[in-house]
């Protein structure tokens, strides 16, 4: 069997990936139903496609946790040693694992985003939630790319940390807290924050969106890069972290 086939079987041999996928999809779709349903109940016409995606970041966090656990669980129970014995080329094994997890995360991201848009359209009443612009397609279809790249980052962090609690803490605090705290640095904080990796991932999705009731600044109004350059920058972070993780894994004991 190929490395990817083995990694797929290993991933789905436990319940946690299934639970993570269900929770990720439920969060995005559930929040879409709540927000658009509330706007419809108040006869508010300002529901937009952006309003259907409030749960996307939480779902992204859930899939990052799943990706990290795919690695750290093997280190925890020592099964990674057996895997390395079966596939002496550690980079090939870890890249296979990364490919499986990233592909799965990307699919979940697409299902969650378009599912949220579909449910939001049902609950939004008279609001026009038709996908009319390239920016709106980018917001929905782009979730798959962002989820996949986030999973790559999560696997890399899992390889580097090797401990579940530590890896999960980093992956949750990094986008939700650390990148926001950067803005508090005197004089240069705002400029540095524009180059934060997850901020650029959000920038790729949010540029050109109609934020509706969320306000013009909901997705950030001052971007350092255009949307596709922001995606490339985010992908560069994912690739760099993965290269560091692969180098580290090749040099230390399992």
Range-by-range predicted roles:
Residues 7, 87-89, 93, 157, ...:
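Generic structural signal for small/hydrophobic residues in well-ordered secondary structure
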Residues 21, 81, 94, 168-169:
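Hydrophobic/aromatic positions within or immediately flanking transmembrane alpha-helices
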């Amino acid at each position: 069997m190929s490395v990817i086939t083995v990694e797929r079987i290993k991933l789905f041999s436990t319940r946690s990936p299934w639970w993570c996928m269900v929770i990720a999809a439920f969060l995005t779709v559930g929040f879409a139903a709540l927000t658009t349903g509330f706007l419809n109940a108040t006869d508010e016409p300002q529901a937009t496609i952006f309003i259907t995606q409030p749960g996307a970041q939480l779902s992204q966090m859930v899939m990052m946790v799943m990706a990290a656990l795919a690695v750290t669980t093997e280190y925890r129970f020592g099964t990674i040693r057996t895997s390395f014995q079966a596939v002496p080329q550690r980079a090939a094994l870890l890249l296979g694992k990364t490919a499986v997890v990233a592909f799965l995360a990307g699919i979940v991201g697409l299902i969650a985003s378009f599912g949220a848009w579909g449910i939001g359209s049902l609950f939004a009443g008279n609001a026009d939630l038709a996908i009319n612009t390239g920016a709106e397609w980018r917001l929905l279809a782009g979730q798959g790319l962002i989820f996949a790249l986030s999973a790559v980052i999560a696997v890399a962090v899992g390889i580097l940390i090797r401990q579940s609690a530590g890896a999960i803490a980093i992956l949750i605090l990094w986008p939700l807290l650390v990148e926001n705290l950067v803005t508090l640095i005197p004089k240069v904080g705002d400029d540095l924050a524009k180059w934060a990796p997850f901020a650029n991932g959000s920038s790729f999705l949010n540029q050109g969106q109609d934020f509706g009731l969320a306000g013009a600044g909901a997705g950030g109004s001052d971007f350092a890069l255009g949307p596709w350059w922001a995606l490339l920058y985010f992908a560069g972070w994912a690739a760099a972290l993965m290269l560091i993780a692969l180098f580290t894994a090749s040099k230390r004991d399992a």
